[in-house]
Amino acid sequence: EIAQCLVGSEMCIRDSLLQYTIKKNRGKMKSAIKKIFVLTGCVLLLVTSMRAQRACLNLSETLWNITLDRSAVWQNDSLYVPPVNIHDLPVHIPTGGWNLLDTPDKIGVTLPATVEQHLWGWNGETFGVTGNYVGVSWFDTKINVPADWRNKRIVMNVASVRFRAEIFVNKKLVGYDLVNSTPFAVDVTPFILPGQENVIAFRITDPNGNFNWKDSQVYTWGEYRTNPSHGFGGITGKVELVATDKLYIGDVFIKNQPDPHSIEVEVTACNETKNPMKAQKMLLTVKEHKGEKVLYRKEYSVENLVVGENKQTFHIHLPVAKLWSTDSPHLYDLSVSVGTDNYTQRFGFRWFEVKDIHGDKQFFLNGKRIVLRTAISWSFWPDNGITPSDELARRQVESAKKLGLNMLNFHRTIGHSNVLDYADELGLLYFEEPGGNQYPINHFNDNNKQSKFYFAYRNEKLVRMIKRDRNHPSLVIYNLHNERGAWPQVQDYAQMRMAHSLDPTRILTYNSSNGENPENEANARFKLHLMPNDTTFYDYGWYDRHHAGGPGCYHDNLYWGKDNYHRFSDHKDEIIYWGEDGAIGTPPRLQLIRDEILQSGTTSGWEAMDYMKWYDAYDSFLKHNGFAKAFPTVDDLTRAMGNVAFYYQGRVIENIRISNTVDAYAVNGWESMKLENHSGIVDNYRYPKGDVEVMARYNQPLFLAVKMNRKVLNVGDTTIVDTCLLYTSDAAD
């Protein structure tokens, strides 16, 4: 709108200023005219600059309505995986007609949003998961589209939905997608009416889903097996409209290199005109993300852009660039301009790899050894259940940093962009799984409708996940399955090749598993992996083993002596990763959660009222049973119980650091929610369950470990005390 105003008013500005100057001071005409043309030049420069930016309308902040379509028939629908031809699909309008949306069940909603967030207990039931809604719902809004978007290419970018979305613009079907929790785009150019109000409606179908940690359960939708995922239905990500010309940047992939000061930039330019375009200029600029310092600026000549996609590769080496690390997370912006379009991608200079140091496989970040200390997150969240607000995403990363962890895992479920954004900004590594990537081994080769749908679906989900997340410097490892009991099949090798071709810069593993992982022999089920910039399949060199359960608290028998203790390993020629360890159940920070719910003013979310009742029960117990002296508040009690798990996890992390052979340790687990996963060391609101200092002291970069082989003694007993100086080389210099 500003650009349009300036373009339309340029002559008016010039004429008005001239007349004003003539009347005010004819004697200074020459100086005034110079100033006028300087101003006019600034206006033109501003207009040119603004034209070089793609235009966006954020639909997430507009107000949406939610309407439950209780009578809709969906149970035996035919399902379609991308790509789809929208003209070949059945059109499902609201049951009884579009006037159904005139009486919504909820109004004034912003995105992301789920039915479970705003209409939990729609059926009068709220206990456990009885308030969940399964079926069809409608999310609709209205948006005014600028008149100057005429003759533009207009795309709707959807960050994610669950499960299926049928998208309507002005009551016409324009889009269809069911690869849930992944981004997709819909070309709405023929359907949007620039200069007018447009009605946007999403028909969401939530057919099934889980409210627990498992991603191996079988869920069906009619005659199809569907990828297991959390059972929330809605628009689970942000939505925007973007307008560009017919020549635009479709994607930018910044490939980190073994020399961490170097990057390879892969630009996808899209030509949607009817003819090839000759001699185009492409400008690449690298600048500090926080600041204005430009490190690199170069214009390249692109001789021929054919109709469709055009990939261009550029190599940039910047010795002056500051490296991204967990202690110094320096970030940069790379901007690419072609034609009238400009695309900016944030990234960091860094390199993560495995090195063999005198026969010992170890992780290295930017040439320094790093021992990964992580926790597994099932990605349940307050309110909408499935997607974090920016505040919660930041709190997740900050809580991990306060506890001294240097990584977290998206475990059995795909990750979230805003969590990775804060991990990039604050310095936390990430390990990601697509979730639900399992299928019964005896049906792999059925080659029927069900198996074809499932494999096409799981591959598309993985493709979208990788393309969405591969520019985040925080993300270092992909894993395809969790506790997969089956050996990799032909389809699994093909999927791994495909994934590695999309992002050859990261470690990719087939499985993170429990069971008897053989230590000194090759084994594809447990150990199959691909290394950065290496297309060789390795079935030895990666030793990942789960010990999910915990002992309840720390025991004397967890340390007997310097070579005999819990999670000791001297197995050096493979990466040693204890992939799940030590589940100890503790309650959430009920008092902090209650205060946050009361401050928000709403208890409509899928678990808010349960936490309120939970707090009241604890508070009543303390006050009426004589425990208030020991625990004056509910938070005093829950925090003390949380410290039991913190102490255990801290001492075991101390053990693996003493070994100096173990390369990674994953706490089981990260967050708890109302139903289970009580072993989480933070609650669903991402509050640490205990005093962070209890666990953080064992994650310090430099500290003296004091280990006793007996801490519980009778009078006259003796104990042996070992001391070990621990230093973490990934600490800041």
Spell out what each predicted region is.
Residues 53-157, 215-228, 232-235, 245, ...:
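Extended carbohydrate-recognition surfaces in non-catalytic/accessory domains of CAZymes
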Residues 151-152, 192-196, 211, 277, ...:
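Short glycine/proline/serine/threonine-rich loop/turn segments at secondary-structure transition edges
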Residues 263-301, 720-729, 733:
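Beta-strand-rich binding/interaction modules
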Residues 1-2, 6-16, 727-733:
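Conserved small/polar residues in nucleotide/adenosyl-binding loops
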Residues 668-722:
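Aromatic-rich peripheral "rim/lid" segments of glycoside hydrolase catalytic domains that contact
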Residues 407-671, 676-684:
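Substrate-binding/catalytic cleft of secreted carbohydrate-active enzymes
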